[in-house]
Amino acid sequence: MRENNQSSTLEFILLGVTGQQEQEDFFYILFLFIYPITLIGNLLIVLAICSDVRLHNPMYFLLANLSLVDIFFSSVTIPKMLANHLLGSKSISFGGCLTQMYFMIALGNTDSYILAAMAYDRAVAISRPLHYTTIMSPRSCIWLIAGSWVIGNANALPHTLLTASLSFCGNQEVANFYCDITPLLKLSCSDIHFHVKMMYLGVGIFSVPLLCIIVSYIRVFSTVFQVPSTKGVLKAFSTCGSHLTVVSLYYGTVMGTYFRPLTNYSLKDAVITVMYTAVTPMLNPFIYSLRNRDMKAALRKLFNKRISS
């Protein structure tokens, strides 16, 4: 067990995305471009949904909450990375590292459960349209969002506390641009067998929403293919296409990072984490708005209102 005074002075070195200065300069410019787009894009989604009464329904309520989580999610890591690069420093305190890890796990899990809630919403809308307003009532939507936040934080807390109990002696270079649980476990000189088992349990909890999404879309597609109208099938696929794209991007990159043995992790994997920590939150507003006429109309209305005022 580490001494209290040691934990207060312990610092980690964030190696960045690649560890090569020339490439780090490229990623600095990339993040400098990505971060404001992420903030503005997701904030516009939230404002458009709040300002347009036609979008005050469960589907857009869940989307607005997803956009808020994406804003927080990208803000946990990118500002620190930009500040470190600008100041020529790569250090992060032990407390700052634990805080970053906690919010990454909590927000990542919350994001995945909201995606599952959105899939459930689509399944109910398509397979049980007559009961939609009853099942997806305002109270149900609030419970879905609250449950997502509770599960996300409940999954993050034990991992953070367990990591706080570890001893770190010798190499303190984190093979990533933020404090992730995998490189931290590899740095520890404590017995991490229990911690690794808990990490994979956490991965299992994180995978539950994916199972819910798969079940929801099996229900959607089984209902859709029973519809004789080709127009109805195309409309259903158009409605679900954006969500499926986001789910594929998010879970595809996350699974590439965490669904494998701890010993296989290296700095090369930091490039994969850029996809779900930075790129996916930036793309979400575009994916959900470009193919959605109601969202595009709400955004135009929002812009016109700002210009006229």
Curated annotation (Swiss-Prot):
Glycans are attached at N5, N264. It holds the Pfam family 7tm_4. Keywords: Cell membrane, Disulfide bond, G-protein coupled receptor, Glycoprotein, Membrane, Olfaction, Receptor, Sensory transduction, Transducer, Transmembrane, Transmembrane helix. Disulfide bonds join C97-C189. It comes from the Eukaryota. Residues 50-57, 121-139, 219-235, 291-309 are cytoplasmic. The chain crosses the membrane at residues 26-49, 58-79, 101-120, 140-158, 196-218, 236-258, 271-290. It is a multi-pass membrane protein. Residues 1-25, 80-100, 159-195, 259-270 are extracellular. Signal peptide: none annotated. It is found in: Cell membrane. GO terms for cellular component: plasma membrane. One of its GO terms (molecular function) is G protein-coupled receptor activity. One of its GO terms (biological process) is signal transduction. SUPFAM superfamilies: Family A G protein-coupled receptor-like (SSF81321). Belongs to the G-protein coupled receptor 1 family. Odorant receptor. This is Olfactory receptor 1A1. It comes from Homo sapiens.
